[in-house]
């Protein structure tokens, strides 16, 4: 909004020329979302407590019983901070901004329904898996249908580490991208089991994709680094800045011991958005590296369930997702969280190295 209001005046007031720089607005989007989260956070948490929006703990995770009653649906705080900051600092004429907000709010709405169902039933049973999946696919298909209508966007798939290997998937690109978004959404959701565990890697991924998106939207840099050029997509770096800022602000209250949990309204929206960011900058396959922690957590659940069925009741892990396995081994929660954050940061650095390793 500020860009649309003030930048046109830059010919008369030269200081407003600074608004044309995406890096400037991304930095301020980060700062704004962070400040909004920290300022609004205490009152928001108190509001959740008054509404009795409290976390119900799965009975199998006995070591978490002390967390019962902690306010949940903190993802609404993230959603407010991100949306406010993006509307303030982004170029609102850019279609990629509105599509990203559509995905962010769409997946967030699914998470809200899931959380609300749990609160009404007063247990941790929300939407059925099939209902949640269908909602996720619906939002992802709608977003992808609108995205491929944009003339500047292509259905080519880029392969990391390989120059010029960009096959055009045609109509097959839509189901592929939908799978990326839905898988990412569920991956973050499964990882959100310890205080600050999911938001840390999400912040790392937000930083990494802000760089990839800025590069993809800059013709000269994209050409030099030989990454797919997507005209206009660089503006989404402002959204990434807001996402990182809101994530840091939420971590202020979600760090161990957590004062609030993000709930599915947070994890589903963040995961779906990370998947969409990967799609926007044509780094869908690289999401496996950037979000490697989410991939491992998801695979641990798939392997556990599959092995349990085919082995007649045996298990690979003491409990899935993987972070619960480490908990049952006696590793302190705070140590698990920090180690996962470190792993996520290393994966982020590996992903960024792809910019030169071609």
From Swiss-Prot:
What is the recorded membrane topology of this protein? Multi-pass membrane protein
Please name the InterPro entries in this protein's record: Glycosyl_transferase_4 (IPR000715), PNAcMuramoyl-5peptid_Trfase (IPR003524), PNAcMuramoyl-5peptid_Trfase_CS (IPR018480)
Among the GO molecular function terms of this UniProt record, one is: metal ion binding
- Pathway where it operates: Cell wall biogenesis; peptidoglycan biosynthesis
Which CDD domains does the annotation name? GT_MraY
According to UniProt, the reaction catalysed is: UDP-N-acetyl-alpha-D-muramoyl-L-alanyl-gamma-D-glutamyl-meso-2,6-diaminopimeloyl-D-alanyl-D-alanine + di-trans,octa-cis-undecaprenyl phosphate = di-trans,octa-cis-undecaprenyl diphospho-N-acetyl-alpha-D-muramoyl-L-alanyl-D-glutamyl-meso-2,6-diaminopimeloyl-D-alanyl-D-alanine + UMP
Cofactors named for this entry:
Mg(2+)
Q: Please, which domain of life does this record's source organism belong to?
A: Bacteria
Gene Ontology terms describing biological process: cell division; cell wall organization; peptidoglycan biosynthetic process; regulation of cell shape
**What would be one Gene Ontology cellular-component term for the protein?**
plasma membrane
Q: What is its EC number?
A: 2.7.8.13
Location in or out of the cell? Cell inner membrane
Location (main, coarse): membrane
Residues passing through the membrane, by range:
28-48, 72-92, 96-116, 133-153, 164-184, 196-216, 233-253, 260-280, 285-305, 335-355
Keyword tags = Cell cycle, Cell division, Cell inner membrane, Cell membrane, Cell shape, Cell wall biogenesis/degradation, Magnesium, Membrane, Metal-binding, Peptidoglycan synthesis, Transferase, Transmembrane, Transmembrane helix
Q: Please name every pair of cysteines joined by a disulfide bond in this record.
A: none
Q: What family, per the record?
A: Belongs to the glycosyltransferase 4 family. MraY subfamily.
Function, as annotated: Catalyzes the initial step of the lipid cycle reactions in the biosynthesis of the cell wall peptidoglycan: transfers peptidoglycan precursor phospho-MurNAc-pentapeptide from UDP-MurNAc-pentapeptide onto the lipid carrier undecaprenyl phosphate, yielding undecaprenyl-pyrophosphoryl-MurNAc-pentapeptide, known as lipid I.
This protein is called what?
Answer: Phospho-N-acetylmuramoyl-pentapeptide-transferase
């Amino acid at each position: 909004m500020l860009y649309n209001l003030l930048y046109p005046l830059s010919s008369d007031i030269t200081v407003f020329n600074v608004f044309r720089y995406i890096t400037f607005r991304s930095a301020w989007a980060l700062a704004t979302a962070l400040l909004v989260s920290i300022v609004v956070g205490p009152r928001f948490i108190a509001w959740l407590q008054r509404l009795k929006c409290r976390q119900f703990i799965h009975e199998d995770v006995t070591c978490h019983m002390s967390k019962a009653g902690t306010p949940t649906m903190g993802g609404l705080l993230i959603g407010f901070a991100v949306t406010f900051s993006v509307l303030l600092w982004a170029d609102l004429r850019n279609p990629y901004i509105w599509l990203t907000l559509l995905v962010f709010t769409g997946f967030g709405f699914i998470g809200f329904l899931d959380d609300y169902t749990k609160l009404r039933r007063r247990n941790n049973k929300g939407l059925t898996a099939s209902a949640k999946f269908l909602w996720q696919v619906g939002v992802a298909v709608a977003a992808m249908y609108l995205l491929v209508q944009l003339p500047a966007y292509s259905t080519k798939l880029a392969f990391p580490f390989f120059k010029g290997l960009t096959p055009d998937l045609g109509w097959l690109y839509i189901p592929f991208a939908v799978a990326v978004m839905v898988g990412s959404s569920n991956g973050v959701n499964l990882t959100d089991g310890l205080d600050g565990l999911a938001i840390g890697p999400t912040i790392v991924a937000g930083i990494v994709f802000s760089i990839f998106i800025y590069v993809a939207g800059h013709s000269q840099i994209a050409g030099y680094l030989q990454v797919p050029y997507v005209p206009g997509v660089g503006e989404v770096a402002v959204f990434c800045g807001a996402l990182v800022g809101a994530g840091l602000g939420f971590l202020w209250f979600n760090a161990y011991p957590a004062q609030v949990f993000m709930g599915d309204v947070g994890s589903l929206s963040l995961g779906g958005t990370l998947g969409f960011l990967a799609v926007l900058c044509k780094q869908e396959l690289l999401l496996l590296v950037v979000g490697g922690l989410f991939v491992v957590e998801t695979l641990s659940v798939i392997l556990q369930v599959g092995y349990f069925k085919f082995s007649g009741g045996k298990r690979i892990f003491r409990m899935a997702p993987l972070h619960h396995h480490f908990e049952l081994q006696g590793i302190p929660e705070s140590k698990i969280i920090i180690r996962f954050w470190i792993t996520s940061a290393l994966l982020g650095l590996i992903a960024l190295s792809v910019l030169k390793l071609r």
